[in-house]
């Protein structure tokens, strides 16, 4: 589990860059996504990009989508406190059709 400086936000995904045609790049619309341990919310920060995101949260025990929503990407929170304790995969698709995935545990 990777925590940020305040030890309450678990890092689900942050832009790390990659290699494309031999040139390092960071996807322009990749959000920073955190899980707030205290409030049990997913925090999605679009880092100033003007993308919109479709968010699907999939239970790893049932492989069913348990939550599906859209966010504008500026700075949004999604309440997952009502979801059962489980491991989840979060799939975020930007309005530019880029897809990002990460995992978190709700407890």
Question: Language model features by range: what are they?
Answer:
Residues 98-107:
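Edge beta-strands of extracellular beta-sandwich domains
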Residues 46, 67-70, 102:
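Short hydrophobic alpha-helix segments
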Residues 47-52, 83-85:
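Short proline/glycine-enriched turn/loop motifs at strand-loop junctions of beta-rich domains
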Residues 2-37:
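Transition segment at domain starts
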Residues 72-94:
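Short, surface-exposed loop/turn motifs with a glycine/proline- and acidic-biased composition
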Residues 59-64, 88:
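Short, glycine-anchored, charge-dense loop/turn motifs used at functional sites
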Residues 54-58:
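Beta-strand signatures of extracellular beta-sandwich domains
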């Amino acid at each position: 589990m990777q925590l940020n400086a305040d030890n309450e936000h678990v890092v689900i995904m942050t832009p790390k860059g990659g290699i494309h045609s031999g040139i390092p790049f960071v996807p322009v619309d990749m959000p920073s996504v955190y899980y707030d341990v205290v409030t049990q919310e997913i925090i999605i920060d679009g880092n100033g990009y003007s993308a919109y995101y479709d968010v699907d949260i999939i239970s790893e025990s049932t492989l069913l989508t348990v939550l599906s929503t859209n966010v504008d990407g500026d700075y949004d929170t999604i309440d997952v406190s009502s979801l059962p304790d489980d491991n989840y995969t979060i799939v975020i698709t930007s309005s530019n059709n880029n897809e990002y995935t990460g995992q978190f545990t709700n407890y």
